[in-house]
């Protein structure tokens, strides 16, 4: 099979700001290279040093890495620790009990502050309450809860008693929740009466009741309900209990359950190509080490920072950079219940000013939607807010188009904040390829270089390295501590999905088409391998075509998919959102031609979309991710048969289906 072609060439480069570089933990490229070389010289010794420096161990480990049952690797296997202790107790013991752990802002703007001492007490009370209901080490607890302090408390309490949590995003349907409860074999469920988002309520408890009524959930003996709104709920006596009632008389102290380094901390479900969700299982020590270390490296965390990751705890970003990473280093962080556009599209920028956020981490999808709003109304433009507290800004979830990167850099970072464009996955646990704010010169659209200790490479379909400048498949050549350990209950699927025989069985397959720059060696993600289009024998990454479209002055957002074509094999279909109102009729046809010509100029005639459809927005999940599988069906003219329960804006499907 021919190589994936990289056809979009970005040459703009931005050096780390002098003030950031001077104060950074990793200052300058020489410091970065020294760490990377240490890892290459003594791989196990490098990771062992970090693990001893970063975590507190009840029982020290001996050997760092056990490769005897590859690809089911073990790290620090004979050591013992507790994740909750490392996130809470050790900071309180160090005299930081009065440091603010969480600044929680509710959907309606109400703000609450929780200290480390408060959070430890709340976690301990809930942990004691769970233990009294027979929940403990080895049990699985499903958490279906809104963005809240209570959500963090529930996760940390599970870790404290050795139970393995599985958080399900609050936007999932009863069917999706049911599948996960059954697959993981949960003995308890933690939920809420209702969820508040954008001024609207979502009845979580009734959705949970529907899921439990579908059968196969007999192991669930306890349903803990957090009272968020006070809305009416059905009640199952003996099974259902109020969170505030069961913790009321519990002790503020709960001895941590000391567990082995490989003890499953959590199982997080991610969608699979076969339709059955994959329960990605993460360890305790290796995972916690890496989310703490990347807080220090990627975000250059300082004790006086106010950190804000806008993700939901239902996704891995919320696990790693809300519930565990920030707390593991003793950070003060903002946790937000709502959405970026309520009550208006200036909400993020107002909150940055209100809470003096210094490190801000959000998704390219959110940035692109806020660009459109800012272009239409200067009152919600970042320039109308005080963003002077910011020093580092980041992106997560998908590659960021170069033009969106430039807007973010100019208008949010005020051309003085480095952007950390982070590449990683649910399965990797934490950041893998990313700029370091005080070391790496950044290039719009590129995640730049792997972190020290991460042996990333670009290979062909046989696992052989490809030359820089030639597109290929992103892999990681050596195991790392935070990697997923297995797919819950399906180790063969784990091997087949991530360590396929076609690549020799020892390379971690990331599933992303990637190219390295000929000169810098920087990595640029070109899109999922599944999203590579074969147009007249040319294999094109969708990301580059989307970036070309978004670079046009009229375009706010674009998503590109393929559909079968008798002439070219596959045709490029683009779904486009403009910075102004959606065009129709002749105006739409003329603008489609303009954009086709634009892509031809930016990339080449081969990449021109055959079909361009304009929408008021794109189909997205409640977490802001574009649902490309739905766009593929629309492009082919097929009926939508997939689960759309997480779709934020169902009406857009009809609009995009009508447009031809």
UniProtKB/Swiss-Prot annotation:
InterPro entries: Ac_CoA_lig, ACAS_N, AMP-bd_C, AMP-bd_C_sf, AMP-binding_CS, AMP-dep_synth/lig_dom, ANL_N_sf. CoA binds at residues 197-200, 317, 536. One of its GO terms (cellular component) is cytosol. Its cofactor is Mg(2+). Mg(2+) binds at residues 550, 552, 555. SUPFAM superfamilies: Acetyl-CoA synthetase-like. It comes from the Bacteria. It holds the Pfam family ACAS_N. ATP binds at residues 397-399, 421-426, 512, 528, 539. It is an enzyme of class 6 (ligase). It catalyses: acetate + ATP + CoA = acetyl-CoA + AMP + diphosphate. Acetylated. Deacetylation by the SIR2-homolog deacetylase activates the enzyme. Disulfide bonds: none annotated. One of its GO terms (biological process) is acetyl-CoA biosynthetic process from acetate. Its EC number is 6.2.1.1. Keywords: Acetylation, ATP-binding, Ligase, Magnesium, Metal-binding, Nucleotide-binding. Gene3D superfamilies: 3.30.300.30, N-terminal domain of ligase-like. GO terms for molecular function: acetate-CoA ligase activity; AMP binding; ATP binding; metal ion binding. The modification N6-acetyllysine is found at residue 625. The keyword Metal-binding applies. Catalyzes the conversion of acetate into acetyl-CoA (AcCoA), an essential intermediate at the junction of anabolic and catabolic pathways. AcsA undergoes a two-step reaction. In the first half reaction, AcsA combines acetate with ATP to form acetyl-adenylate (AcAMP) intermediate. In the second half reaction, it can then transfer the acetyl group from AcAMP to the sulfhydryl group of CoA, forming the product AcCoA. Belongs to the ATP-dependent AMP-binding enzyme family. This is Acetyl-coenzyme A synthetase. It comes from Burkholderia thailandensis (strain ATCC 700388 / DSM 13276 / CCUG 48851 / CIP 106301 / E264). The gene is acsA.
């Amino acid at each position: 099979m021919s190589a994936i072609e990289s056809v979009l060439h970005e040459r703009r480069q931005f050096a780390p700001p002098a003030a950031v570089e001077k104060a950074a933990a990793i200052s300058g490229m020489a410091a970065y290279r020294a760490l990377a070389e240490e890892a290459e010289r003594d791989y196990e010794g490098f990771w062992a040093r970090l693990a001893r420096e970063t975590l507190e161990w009840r029982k020290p480990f001996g050997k760092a890495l056990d490769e005897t049952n590859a690809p089911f690797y073990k790290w620090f296997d004979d050591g013992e620790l507790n994740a909750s202790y490392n996130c809470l107790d050790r900071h309180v013991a160090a005299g930081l009990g009065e440091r603010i752990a969480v600044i929680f802002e509710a959907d309606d703007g109400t703000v609450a502050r929780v200290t480390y001492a408060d959070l430890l007490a709340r976690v301990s009370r809930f942990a004691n309450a769970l233990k009294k209901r027979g929940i403990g080490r080895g049990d699985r607890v499903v958490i279906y809860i809104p963005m809240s302090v209570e959500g963090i408390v529930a996760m940390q309490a599970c870790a404290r008693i050795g139970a393995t949590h599985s958080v399900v995003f609050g936007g999932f349907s009863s069917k999706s929740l049911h599948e996960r409860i059954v697959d993981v074999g949960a003995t308890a469920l933690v939920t809420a009466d209702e969820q508040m988002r954008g001024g609207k309520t979502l009845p979580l408890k009734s959705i949970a009741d529907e899921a439990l009524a579908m059968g196969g959930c007999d192991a669930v003996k306890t349903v803990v309900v957090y009272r968020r709104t006070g809305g009416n709920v059905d009640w199952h006596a003996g099974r259902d209990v109020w969170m505030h009632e069961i913790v009321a008389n519990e002790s503020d102290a709960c001895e941590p359950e000391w567990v082995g380094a490989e003890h499953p901390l959590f199982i997080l479900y991610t969608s699979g190509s076969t339709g059955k969700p994959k329960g990605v299982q993460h360890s305790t020590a290796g995972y916690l080490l890496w989310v703490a270390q990347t807080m220090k490296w990627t975000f250059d965390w300082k004790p006086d920072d106010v950190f804000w990751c806008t993700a939901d705890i239902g996704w891995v970003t919320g696990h790693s950079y809300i519930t565990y990473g920030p707390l593991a280093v003793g950070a003060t962080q903002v946790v937000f219940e709502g959405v970026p556009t309520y009550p208006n599209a200036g909400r993020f920028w107002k909150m940055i000013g209100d809470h003096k956020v210094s490190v801000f981490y959000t998704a390219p999808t959110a940035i692109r939607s806020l660009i459109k709003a800012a272009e239409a109304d200067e009152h919600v433009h970042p320039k109308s807010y005080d963003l002077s507290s910011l020093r580092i800004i980041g992106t997560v979830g998908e590659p960021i188009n170069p033009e969106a990167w430039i807007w973010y850099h100019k208008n949010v970072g005020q051309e003085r904040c480095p952007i950390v464009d982070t590449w990683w996955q649910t399965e990797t646990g934490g950041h893998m390829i990313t700029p370091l704010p005080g070391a790496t010169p950044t290039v719009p659209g590129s995640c730049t270089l792997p972190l020290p200790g991460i042996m990333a490479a670009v290979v062909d379909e046989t696992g052989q390295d490809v030359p820089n400048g030639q597109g290929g498949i992103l892999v990681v050549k050596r195991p790392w501590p935070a990697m997923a350990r297995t797919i819950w209950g399906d180790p063969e699927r784990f091997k087949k999905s991530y360590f396929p025989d076609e690549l020799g069985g020892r390379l971690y397959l990331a599933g992303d088409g990637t190219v390295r720059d000929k000169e810098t060696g920087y990595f640029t993600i070109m899109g999922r391998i599944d999203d590579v289009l074969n147009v007249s024998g040319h294999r094109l990454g969708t990301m580059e075509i989307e970036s070309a479209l978004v670079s046009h002055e009229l375009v706010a957002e674009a998503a590109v998919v393929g559909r079968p074509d008798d002439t070219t094999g596959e045709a490029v279909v683009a779904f486009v959102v403009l910075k102004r109102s959606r065009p129709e009729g002749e105006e739409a046809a003329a603008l489609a031609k303009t954009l086709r010509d634009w892509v031809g100029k930016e990339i080449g005639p081969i990449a021109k979309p055959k079909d361009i459809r304009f929408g008021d927005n794109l189909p997205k999940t409640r977490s802001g991710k574009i649902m490309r599988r739905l766009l593929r069906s629309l492009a082919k003219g097929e009926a939508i048969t997939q689960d759309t329960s997480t779709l934020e804006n169902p009406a857009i499907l009809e609009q995009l289906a009508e447009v031809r």
